[in-house]
Regions:
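Active-site beta-strand->loop segment that positions catalytic residues and contacts the acyl thioester
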Residues: 80-96, 105-114, 142-144, 314-322
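Short, charged beta-turn/beta-strand-edge "cap" motif at the junction between a beta-strand
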Residues: 102-110, 207-210
Length: 322
């Protein structure tokens, strides 16, 4: 498998500005460049532009495909991290992207979470219709024996925390501080000579997280839309997912027969994110967040601080807590 390309990801229609708007709304990234037509027209690119984090939204599995190859019997998968390289070209409405997917490597380690655990990584190479290389995402998945995770109980089942009205108000005030920072920078430039190692960066607060917020994130990934993707077809059972989790997620044949089974929200390996009882069947304490969204938060945080005249060139993040 390693180093050999697998079926690429391709959307069926060109991207639309509303795809970008839906994405930043789901990721709580209130940058006017990506949703306000008039503001964007006055900026560097003269039109609405996708955030750098958007590339993962055009994949058919938020980057996990090349990091989940080969069979590990009776296993499950969670995201472990993403490393990104960006090469300059931006994504606009009307673009058509393709993701070239190549498995990269793997290592098996002993973990307190699930005993022997496979950390597998794969590259997602995003190109536009002109062949411009936009970005590379090296995604790492954590593949483990489901029964081990449940038996070892590293993450005990818990209920959602309860927030007071004052706590929620304080969070909203803190969230607005980052938004206000972006407004104040506007179309301005953050010059290299004006920053130093050790400068204190602004705080960005995201949350509180809930099943509602996770569902909003999930629906911003274009591959979750019925019929929107050229699906290569994956045999989840052949990769080792347990029978109750394998399902028909991203199954192109089932999508034409009964798409309710295929979009990943209600059935299949991804449903543990939204349904606590299924989360606990794979060793999670309750409904939990999407790794690819965590990666987007990192990229959006850095890009929002840098402003439209800056860009993220390289980022490497590990997802330590779902």
């Amino acid at each position: 498998y390693l180093g050999k390309p697998i079926a690429p990801a391709r959307m069926k229609e060109p991207l639309h500005n509303n795809d970008f708007r839906r994405w930043v709304q789901a990721m709580h990234y209130a940058n006017l460049l990506h949703y306000d037509h008039d503001y964007a027209a006055e900026g560097r690119w003269g039109r609405l532009v996708a955030p750098q984090s958007f590339a993962v939204a055009v994949d058919d599995g938020h980057g996990a495909g090349p990091a989940c190859v080969g069979c590990i019997p009776d296993s499950h998968l969670i995201f472990g991290g993403d490393e990104w390289w960006f090469y300059g070209p931006r994504i606009y409405g009307g673009d058509e992207l393709v993701n070239e997917k190549v498995p990269f490597d793997y290592v098996v380690k002993e973990t307190s979470f699930a005993g022997p655990t496979c950390f597998q990584s794969g590259d997602n190479n995003y190109y536009n219709q002109n062949g411009d290389f936009i970005a590379r995402q090296r995604s790492t998945s954590i593949r483990y024996a489901r029964e081990n995770a449940v038996e070892m109980g590293a993450m005990e089942a818990t209920e959602d925390p309860v927030w007071t009205e004052q706590e929620l108000k304080d969070l909203e005030d803190k969230k607005y501080e980052f938004i206000k920072m972006m407004h104040e920078l506007g179309h301005g430039k953050r010059y290299w000579d004006d920053i130093e190692v050790g400068d204190e960066l602004p705080v960005r607060v995201i949350g509180p997280h809930s099943v509602a917020s996770f569902a909003t994130e999930w629906r911003a990934y274009l591959f979750t839309i019925w019929g929107g993707t050229h699906r290569p077809g994956l045999d989840m059972a052949a990769m080792g997912f347990t029978e109750e989790f394998a399902g028909h997620e991203n199954d192109p044949v089932m999508e034409r027969d009964n798409p309710e089974w295929t979009d990943g929200a209600y059935f299949g390996p991804s449903r543990g994110h939204l349904f606590p009882e299924w989360a606990r069947k794979i060793g999670m304490p309750r409904g939990y967040g999407y790794g690819a969204s965590m990666g987007a938060w990192v990229l959006d945080y850095l890009a929002g601080w840098a402003g439209e005249w800056g860009m993220v060139v390289h980022s490497k993040a590990s997802y330590r807590g779902p």
